[in-house]
């Protein structure tokens, strides 16, 4: 017979698990560079929810609000509605296209209404813009970035755009590398957001001992540095992963075996405990294979992954300590940090812009991984919002670096990629308070419902006892 205390703990555990976002990053383009349509997103979201040996990944982080060009809302939105996949929205901030990004956001709210709003767990204004604007980003040809002051103005514009709408309470954040967050010159950005998104890739920390056996320690250290500047704000894990194939980075070897180890040691403690968007479900198709390639399903979109995704009890045993190390003010959100990969573009598929940026689909198509400083970082593989291999500069949708993060509960943890001196990173202050799930439509209402349901279960069982 269970005691009331045990029942309460179980119910709250269930409610907490339901509140945490667990998903992948999704670019706007396919691995071959062509634009994804609604059916493509639906197929990806459906696959992620039904991956073998998992409980399903039902959240999606986007890099852009735009479908191709202009200001038409991205087709990932109706796909998410059809597949009941939560969304961490992304607006591509570099390249001067913010007017169209905001117009697309407003259009999506008007067109899809509450069906859309209830799925939104957060909004990311920009992705690795501060890294690309830094000395290290420039040396690595990571693509076009923006100054922190301009990014702050964009964040304010997005707040104004959603005021009075179904998304009026959605928490707004920014995604960047950890060294961008810890750079005091970027402090204004940390002050302006509700949560900090962390992109971290120990694989690319090529000036350090970065073998797969060192990866977890590097990741955890980066998270702690990001958390230190986050104050009482949430840190969301918006991008991390280990490549299944491709060239080595110092001691880091790309292989299915190592990707599995990274999944077990870094991913499993995060999943269902911290808002996490993994990089990536698929970034290769046919002959279009980026170097390195991070896709866990290989060249074919299938629910059968390249390696076992199940998380054993031993791999999850450190989940509570992992959560504690990355969370800002809430026990639910934890963050881990590691270095970043090459830069990205809003297209979001394998396609590094000529600055070493990737397409948001998560593959690389050019650019190089220049290591600068004692612990230099490479921009993330998702550097382009399109999500597919899209060559060109990272200045606009489909050309810049793309990384985004989201969480089904509206709270999660993130970490920025690791790199030390010479990059422009913003130090977070403890100024604004993270929005609570109850403060916004969508994930907040689901979270409230989850907790309410758990409370009802507790009450009913308590009476029965």
Curated annotation (Swiss-Prot):
GO BP annotations, alphabetical order: cell wall organization; polysaccharide catabolic process
Any Pfam family: Glyco_hydro_17
Positions annotated as propeptide: 443-465
Glycosylated residue positions: 183, 318
Superkingdom of this protein's organism: Eukaryota
Active site: 128 (proton donor), 239 (nucleophile)
Region (Disordered): 320-356, 380-440
Modifications the protein undergoes after translation, according to the UniProt entry: The GPI-anchor is attached to the protein in the endoplasmic reticulum and serves to target the protein to the cell surface. There, the glucosamine-inositol phospholipid moiety is cleaved off and the GPI-modified mannoprotein is covalently attached via its lipidless GPI glycan remnant to the 1,6-beta-glucan of the outer cell wall layer.
Disulfide bonds: none
Induction or repression: Expression is under the control of the nsdD transcription factor required for sexual development. Transcript level is the highest at the beginning of asexual development and decreases thereafter to increase again at the late stage.
Top enzyme class: hydrolase
Any GO CC annotation of this UniProt entry: side of membrane
Annotated lipid attachment (GPI-anchor amidated glycine): 442
Localization annotation: Cell membrane; Secreted, Cell wall; Secreted
Extent of Low complexity compositional bias: 320-333, 380-438
Entry EC number(s): 3.2.1.39
InterPro entries assigned: Beta-glucan_modifiers (IPR050732), Glyco_hydro_17 (IPR000490), Glycoside_hydrolase_SF (IPR017853)
Coiled coil ranges: none
Bilayer topology term: Lipid-anchor; GPI-anchor
Family named by the database record: Belongs to the glycosyl hydrolase 17 family.
Role: Glucanases play a role in cell expansion during growth, in cell-cell fusion during mating, and in spore release during sporulation. This enzyme may be involved in beta-glucan degradation and also function biosynthetically as a transglycosylase.
Name by which UniProt lists this protein: Probable glucan endo-1,3-beta-glucosidase eglC
